[in-house]
Curated annotation (Swiss-Prot):
Family: Belongs to the ABC transporter superfamily. Sulfate/tungstate importer (TC 3.A.1.6) family.
Cellular component GO terms, alphabetical: plasma membrane
GO molecular function, one term: ATP binding
Gene that produces this protein: wtpC
Provenance organism: Archaeoglobus fulgidus (strain ATCC 49558 / DSM 4304 / JCM 9628 / NBRC 100126 / VC-16)
Lineage start: Archaea, Methanobacteriati, Methanobacteriota, Archaeoglobi, Archaeoglobales
Topology of the protein relative to the lipid bilayer: Peripheral membrane protein
Protein name, per record: Molybdate/tungstate import ATP-binding protein WtpC
Residues passing through the membrane, by range: none
Origin superkingdom: Archaea
Catalyzed reaction equations: tungstate(in) + ATP + H2O = tungstate(out) + ADP + phosphate + H(+)
Subunit structure and binding partners: The complex is composed of two ATP-binding proteins (WtpC), two transmembrane proteins (WtpB) and a solute-binding protein (WtpA).
Listed EC numbers: 7.3.2.6
Residues given in the record as ATP binding sites: G31, P32, T33, G34, A35, G36, K37, S38
Amino acid sequence: MFLKVRAEKRLGNFRLNVDFEMGRDYCVLLGPTGAGKSVFLELIAGIVKPDRGEVRLNGADITPLPPERRGIGFVPQDYALFPHLSVYRNIAYGLRNVERVERDRRVREMAEKLGIAHLLDRKPARLSGGERQRVALARALVIQPRLLLLDEPLSAVDLKTKGVLMEELRFVQREFDVPILHVTHDLIEAAMLADEVAVMLNGRIVEKGKLKELFSAKNGEVAEFLSARNLLLKVSKILD
């Protein structure tokens, strides 16, 4: 498997205890608020260190490495753009040690591919939700990551923009040939994007497989979690 995580982390009364694997595909991690999904991504990215266990990427143990040496692109839920920097400088932030001409080429090429070349001189405050998401994606991808982590990347956009951005996320995976681990509580995102789906409840990965398979899961908690969201999915289709 391309990514393997077997690790534990305690934060106050919360305990993350994960055994997770994924290949070079698009994996969506589903779970309710408070399940530990964001902490899990931060552990993979190196922002949070495990108390025990390891993170392996393409066979190599990256647990001791700092975030900037892991080769992982990370888009946090709030996008974490620097408000005082232009779009250009936000995208270029991870290329501080790259020679200037090469840095400029990569920033402009990435902006062109994601349709934000006309925004390079703007500050984040002047961007729409969809534009901010594209800038955050560009910043994560410009470092040429081996893995892309997305934490609730569509939670701050309206439904129309969400549909467009879901198509763009699939384009990103194909265009850049990068495995993606996408965290959400939204079953529609999983249905539209995922090659595989994992379910996290109370800090543990409790099921993993194709989405259709998970609807017949024998785990009662998983069945309850998915059935409630499946009802919402059917209702949303009726309303559309």
